[in-house]
Amino acid sequence: MSRQDTKNQGSRFDRAVAIFKKHGGILRTAQALRAGIHPTTLYTMRDSGALDMVSRGVYRLAGKSPLGDPDLVTVATRVPGGVICLISALAFHELTTQIPHEVHVALPRGAEEPRLDHPPIRTYRFTGEAFTQGVETHRIDSVSLRIYSPEKTLADCFKFRNKVGFDTVVEAIRFYRERRSVKVDDLMRYAAICRVKKIIRPYLEALL
């Protein structure tokens, strides 16, 4: 390689690092290419150890602090149209003692099923306001994470009580009362959207 080629490669490398830093140090392959990083530069950075592979097709600048929650970061990056829900959302909001063995993700009906080697995920199909309402965006390890609010998550858990377990639902209500400012109006609004208003009302009256 000539001195000029080496200089050009170094310039492309530095530009790629700057692009990664602009995006919090983590990018999907498609994002990196759209941002102007040449495929050869991307794979050279990977092979030289300048990038760590978080998951297939997800790269992160090497040398950064360990990810606080690599599973959520991977899903947020690989499934940007999804919303973290149910047990995973309860765990994020500290409303359960359950340790999720899969990342629970809501998708709009008709969306393509994600293909991830890791982490394992469980998808749920939500429609209309049941999908769009109650979504919060949090920054985690410099990545935007879409996740349902505590109140929307409780309503979802009542709706999917046969899947998450009713003991988990009751525990979540109790933790919500103890650890959060109770927003009854929001709870009932999301319960109406999820069509569990009649089911949730007596538990709210008893526990809240």
Place the predicted regions along the sequence by residue.
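Nucleic-acid-binding surface
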Residues: 11-31, 35, 41, 46, ...
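Short, Lys/Arg-enriched N-terminal segment that forms or immediately precedes the first helix
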Residues: 1-7
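Glycine-centered, phosphate/nucleic-acid-interacting loop/turn motifs that mediate DNA/RNA or nucleotide
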Residues: 49
